[in-house]
């Protein structure tokens, strides 16, 4: 679903940023 994908993207983005 969109929310599941979005959450995953956010998780990866935060990890990459950190």
UniProtKB/Swiss-Prot annotation:
Compartment list: Cytoplasm
Major subcellular site: cytoplasm
Domain of life: Eukaryota
GO biological process, one term: steroid metabolic process
Alphabetical keyword list: Cytoplasm, Lipid metabolism, Steroid metabolism, Transferase
EC number: 2.8.2.1
GO molecular function: aryl sulfotransferase activity
One GO CC annotation: cytoplasm
Reactions performed catalytically: a phenol + 3'-phosphoadenylyl sulfate = an aryl sulfate + adenosine 3',5'-bisphosphate + H(+)
Function, in words: Sulfotransferase that utilizes 3'-phospho-5'-adenylyl sulfate (PAPS) as sulfonate donor to catalyze the sulfate conjugation of phenolic compounds.
Family to which this protein belongs: Belongs to the sulfotransferase 1 family.
Protein name: Phenol sulfotransferase
